[in-house]
Amino acid sequence: MSQVFKDFDLSSVWEANSWADENYKEAPFTPEILAAVESELGYKLPQSFIELMAVQNGGIFVKNCFPTTQRNSWAKDHVQICEVSGIGFEKEGSLCGAMGQKLWLEEWEYPPIGVYFANDPSGGHAMFALDYRECGKDGEPKVVFVEQESDFEIVELAPDFETFIRSLRHEDEFSDE
């Protein structure tokens, strides 16, 4: 039995949103689709990411802000996560969709550090990524924030994806300043 997300309700993570469903939420993935996505990406996705996507395969989080002391173009005390890419090929915003990993690496020239899995409200000018630089392509990646407007500065947010998800806060907890 998995020890990932012990005592945590994964169904509470996702917000109902028809636009995100249409563009980011993939159908449930099979082991074959997961293997094909990991092969195309060149990285083994962390078990915590896989388990969250098994509940809902992409979309928008209810708690969509991560506290940080690193100022960014969005806010001084947090970063906001928007759409989260599902595991698949069909939806435009899925990991291997038209607006997925290849777009961020090849057209936007984001650094090849791992898997870009979500954006912020800037529409692609800042991304959330699973950073495999220290752990290798099969290891447990950190979660980082990469901001294009700051010369692709990489800011570590969490030591792993589960910690990242557990640390998310609702946007109402932050001021608009």
Regions found by a protein language model. Give the residues of each.
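A short local loop/turn or secondary-structure capping micro-motif enriched for an aromatic residue
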Residues: 136-138, 152-153
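A surface-exposed partner-binding patch
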Residues: 1-123, 172, 176
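Low-complexity, glycine/alanine/valine/leucine- and proline-rich hydrophobic stretches
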Residues: 125-136
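Short, surface-exposed beta-strand/loop "edge" segments at domain boundaries and coil↔beta transitions
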Residues: 123-127, 150-157
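Short, flexible loop/turn elements at secondary-structure junctions
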Residues: 119-121, 134, 147-150
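Compact, glycine/acidic-enriched structural inserts
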Residues: 144-147, 154-170
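N-terminal processing/targeting junctions
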Residues: 138, 167-175
